[in-house]
Amino acid sequence: MGRNREDDITPLQQETLDEICRYVSAKGYPPTVKEMSETFGISHASVHDRINQLVRKGYLKREEGKARGLTVTKHPQTNAVALVAVPIVGTVAAGHPIFAHENITGEVLVEASVVGSGKCFALYTQGDSMIDAGINDGDLIIVRRQPIAEDGDIVIALLDDEATVKRLKIDNELIELVPENPRLKPIRVKPEDELRILGKVVGRKRI
């Protein structure tokens, strides 16, 4: 059975959808109507019209009252879910551990294949302790919430109420939080320490 022609999008609507996808891929969040108006050299009303048609046809989802409230829900070539919104919940130290307050400060759009079926959150990193794992100062890391992790996983760990991102090393009774920077030493978890795994790092975005 062929696709319903009501779901077909025009070249101008395709151009708009492609620009939203490009913008999200580059910056991690969708453009505003004003930004798209400037990009295409058209009026705000024309941008709204394109967005309304894409929402009606199921290619976009719009959250009312937000300037950056667009989410791409499918692509005409794949007809597959493309992006999901993940909450940003603060800053985690990637050097010296600091307390991370789980206050939601915003959202970032992430490929659905990265998130999978789990619940995720995002955090900005500070410091250079994980540079050899490709995690640099200021990166936004995507974390899948899970209370346990395996040896070798990069995790967000809460150690005595201080959060840090490190590689988890488990060797019999020995547990260490290992930096990916040869200049820094591992943090050995002592029996009296309170260690809690907040989640596993599954991706990152360089904003």
From Swiss-Prot:
Coiled coil: none annotated. The record marks 94-95 as: Cleavage. The keyword Transcription applies. CDD domains: S24_LexA-like. It comes from the Bacteria. Transmembrane segments: none annotated. GO terms for molecular function: DNA binding; serine-type endopeptidase activity. Pfam families: LexA_DNA_bind, Peptidase_S24. The keyword DNA-binding applies. The active site is at residues 129, 166. Keywords: Autocatalytic cleavage, DNA damage, DNA repair, DNA replication, DNA-binding, Hydrolase, Repressor, SOS response, Transcription, Transcription regulation. Residues 33-52 bind DNA. It catalyses: Hydrolysis of Ala-|-Gly bond in repressor LexA. One of its GO terms (biological process) is proteolysis. Gene3D superfamilies: Umud Fragment, subunit A, Winged helix-like DNA-binding domain superfamily/Winged helix DNA-binding domain. Its EC number is 3.4.21.88. Represses a number of genes involved in the response to DNA damage (SOS response), including recA and lexA. In the presence of single-stranded DNA, RecA interacts with LexA causing an autocatalytic cleavage which disrupts the DNA-binding part of LexA, leading to derepression of the SOS regulon and eventually DNA repair. Belongs to the peptidase S24 family. HAMAP family: LexA. Homodimer. This is LexA repressor.
